[in-house]
């Protein structure tokens, strides 16, 4: 399902990020005890009154060294391009500024719903001053104190009221995948090679992909696929795609819509922090993942080259131990024929269900190999486990005390489940729950 998008805009220091974190709530602070897994704070998903939406903090995309007005223009451009609803944040302490009026004039022309959030209204006496913001011509101002959580419910009500009423329902039989990675890793050339047609215009200059469309195709066995392009959704007019953070945001949106993600690495440049960041987001989102090393034809090789590359990838992406690695060349089409079959296989892993009886046999065998740990004389007791969902496969393990389930033992159980059932290319989630 494609979620509607809400963008937060406003000049610096009005509290955009604080409001973003307040709306996102606990969803923003996802932490896993594995190095390299981080969720970027410029993009997340949120929910209010049973309506889900994607949330963008455009201020997090800015180049802080850019001129003040250029930053604001940049934000407004992103909002106009990406958002279904725009939240315009101003400061109740400072009143209406020239910069606020400048942004308002831009937003007024978008013909998109704009919610005016007057932030930093931290006490009732300040409410009398918010009426000055009617001069911006954007409708009723909403008094907010994002630090204290006051008024955010009213803003959320307004967001939900203005979200598109029809949400695209996607065919569950179609496998959706995206190619993500830094500019100039060869995503466009890979797309062209996979499709066998020049559907996306590619250039050797980084950041020159302009098209923004999903591409549907069918393999020889009748399996339907949708390839999601990371060049931006509903793109119109100029898009600020020269910043790495904007590229990160677009990749995150593509990941959210995908079942399987192809993490593309440029063999000529190796692994960068950007790659780890995006891969971490895909891992946390529970997506199937394939690590694709492109431009393999440009690398000088000996008998140890592949093994050395694989070892380095496993070391740098320790949290992706389940993800297969494939070395390809879009230019020579080396191993590209393997990709559709790998995507299909990993999609099947994402949707695999294990019966409780078979699962519990594996859990009991695991306990026999490695008995449950103790803490202060009390031993963890596992009663049974059951699979509760797919995409990604998620299992609940019922225990006597959740606190006794140490991270290392949970990882051991995960490894035993993987050995028994495979689950190639997909994260699996294990949740300890106290039996009532």
From Swiss-Prot:
Coiled-coil segments on the chain, per record: none
Biological source species: Streptococcus thermophilus (strain ATCC BAA-491 / LMD-9)
Keywords: GTP-binding, Nucleotide-binding, Repeat, Ribosome biogenesis
Record GO terms (molecular function): GTP binding; ribosome binding
Family: Belongs to the TRAFAC class TrmE-Era-EngA-EngB-Septin-like GTPase superfamily. EngA (Der) GTPase family.
Described purpose of this protein according to its UniProt entry: GTPase that plays an essential role in the late steps of ribosome biogenesis.
Name the record gives this protein: GTPase Der
The keyword Nucleotide-binding belongs to this UniProt entry's keyword annotation: yes
Residues that bind GTP 1: 10-17, 57-61, 119-122
Domain KH-like: 352-436
Disulfide bridge positions per record: none
One GO biological process term: ribosome biogenesis
Xref: PROSITE patterns: G_ENGA
Presence of keyword Hydrolase: no
Domain of life, per lineage: Bacteria
Record domain EngA-type G: where: 4-167, 175-351
Quaternary structure note: Associates with the 50S ribosomal subunit.
Annotated positions binding GTP 2: 181-188, 229-233, 294-297
């Amino acid at each position: 399902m494609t979620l509607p998008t809400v963008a937060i805009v406003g000049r610096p220091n009005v509290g955009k990020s604080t409001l973003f974190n307040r709306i996102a709530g606990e969803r923003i602070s996802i932490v896993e005890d594995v190095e390299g897994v981080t969720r970027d704070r410029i993009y997340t998903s949120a929910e209010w009154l049973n309506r889900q939406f994607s949330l963008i903090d455009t201020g997090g995309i800015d180049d802080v060294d850019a001129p003040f007005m250029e930053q604001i223009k940049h934000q407004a451009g992103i909002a106009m391009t990406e958002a279904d609803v725009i939240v315009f944040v101003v400061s109740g302490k400072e009143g209406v500024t020239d910069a606020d009026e400048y942004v308002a004039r831009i937003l007024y022309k978008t013909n998109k719903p704009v919610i005016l959030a007057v932030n930093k209204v931290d006490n009732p006496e300040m409410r009398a001053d918010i009426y000055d913001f009617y001069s911006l011509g954007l409708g009723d101002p909403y008094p907010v104190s994002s630090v204290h959580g006051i008024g955010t419910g009213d803003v959320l009500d307004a967001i939900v009221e203005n979200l598109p009423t029809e949400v695209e329902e996607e065919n569950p039989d179609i496998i959706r995948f995206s190619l993500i990675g830094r500019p100039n890793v060869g995503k466009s050339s890979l797309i062209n090679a996979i499709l066998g047609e020049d559907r996306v215009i590619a250039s050797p200059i980084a950041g020159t992909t302009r098209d923004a469309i999903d591409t549907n195709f069918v393999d020889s066995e009748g399996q339907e696929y949708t390839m999601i392009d990371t060049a931006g959704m509903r793109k119109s007019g100029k898009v600020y795609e020269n910043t790495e953070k904007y590229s990160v945001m677009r990749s995150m949106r593509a990941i959210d819509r995908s079942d399987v993600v192809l993490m593309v690495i440029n063999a000529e440049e190796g692994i960068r922090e950007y790659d780890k960041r995006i891969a971490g987001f895909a891992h946390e989102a529970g997506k199937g993942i394939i690590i694709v090393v492109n431009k393999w034809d440009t690398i000088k090789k000996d008998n140890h080259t592949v093994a050395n590359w694989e070892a380095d990838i496993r070391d740098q992406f320790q949290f992706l131990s389940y993800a297969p690695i494939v070395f390809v060349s879009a230019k020579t089409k080396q191993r590209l024929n393997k990709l559709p079959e790998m995507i299909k296989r990993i999609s099947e892993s994402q949707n695999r269900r294990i019966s409780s009886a078979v699962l519990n046999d594996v859990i009991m065998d695991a306990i026999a190999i490695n008995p449950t740990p103790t803490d202060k004389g009390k031993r963890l007791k596992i009663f049974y486990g059951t699979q509760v969902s797919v995409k990604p496969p998620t299992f609940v393990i019922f225990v006597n005390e959740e606190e006794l389930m140490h991270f290392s033992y949970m990882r051991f159980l995960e490894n035993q489940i993987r050995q028994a059932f495979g689950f190639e290319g997909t994260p699996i989630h294990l949740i300890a729950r106290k039996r009532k």
